[in-house]
Amino acid sequence: MSKVTVIDHPLIQHKLTLIRDKNTGSKDFRALVREISMLMGYEVTRDLSLEEIEIETPVCTTKAKTLTGRKLGIVPILRAGLGMVDGILELIPAAKVGHVGLYRDPETLEPVEYYVKLPTDVHERELIVLDPMLATGGSANAAIQFIKDRGATNIKLVCLVSCPQGIAAVQEAHPDVDIYVAAIDETLDDHAYIVPGLGDAGDRLFGTK
């Protein structure tokens, strides 16, 4: 079973309150999502491998640690996941960025892929999938499966707000994918919105309805 980490740092929780507020406009919403994503990135990357090397400081020769192991990749789920990219890139600017675009078939209600662009060496990278909301888990599960189908084997899912139903759905479909969230809300309403949630993250990021 995958691990679920709730990142409850005080700064994250404060900023999360601000994006939940219906009176927060798109400009501030975008800035806050970027800031929360960056803060979450510290925990998401906590297990990156290090190796010891020898360097010259202005004073002497010393041993120091540097990143090693797998290269990193960021994969936002379009469109709302785009709002989280810049915050993560501020921490890991060398990461490559892929994209997964999905829409829901009006007849079957199943997610359908309309765009996937990933690094060619995706099988060699640790991928961080970004989506602000983990509601039913349908979009996240589909995106993760599309990524796996192209060779990825090391994937983490990062969301701002989640609910028990979405977490359970991802854990059942992808028990090898660890999940990082800033909050686990109560439930879903009849329209599959997270309650209390923050509304439609994509609309609030981009000022659409």
Swiss-Prot record:
Binds 1 Mg(2+) ion per subunit. The magnesium is bound as Mg-PRPP. One of its GO terms (biological process) is UMP salvage. It is an enzyme of class 2 (transferase). It comes from the Bacteria. Pfam families: UPRTase. Coiled coil: none annotated. InterPro entries: PRibTrfase_dom, PRTase-like, Upp_B, UPRTase/APRTase, Ura_phspho_trans. Keywords: Allosteric enzyme, Glycosyltransferase, GTP-binding, Magnesium, Nucleotide-binding, Transferase. The keyword Glycosyltransferase applies. Pathway: Pyrimidine metabolism; UMP biosynthesis via salvage pathway; UMP from uracil: step 1/1. Its cofactor is Mg(2+). Uracil binds at residues 194, 199-201. 5-phospho-alpha-D-ribose 1-diphosphate binds at residues 79, 104, 131-139, 200. It catalyses: UMP + diphosphate = 5-phospho-alpha-D-ribose 1-diphosphate + uracil. Allosterically activated by GTP. Catalyzes the conversion of uracil and 5-phospho-alpha-D-ribose 1-diphosphate (PRPP) to UMP and diphosphate. PANTHER family: ADENINE PHOSPHORIBOSYLTRANSFERASE (PTHR32315), URACIL PHOSPHORIBOSYLTRANSFERASE, CHLOROPLASTIC (PTHR32315:SF4). This is Uracil phosphoribosyltransferase. It comes from Alkaliphilus oremlandii (strain OhILAs) (Clostridium oremlandii (strain OhILAs)).
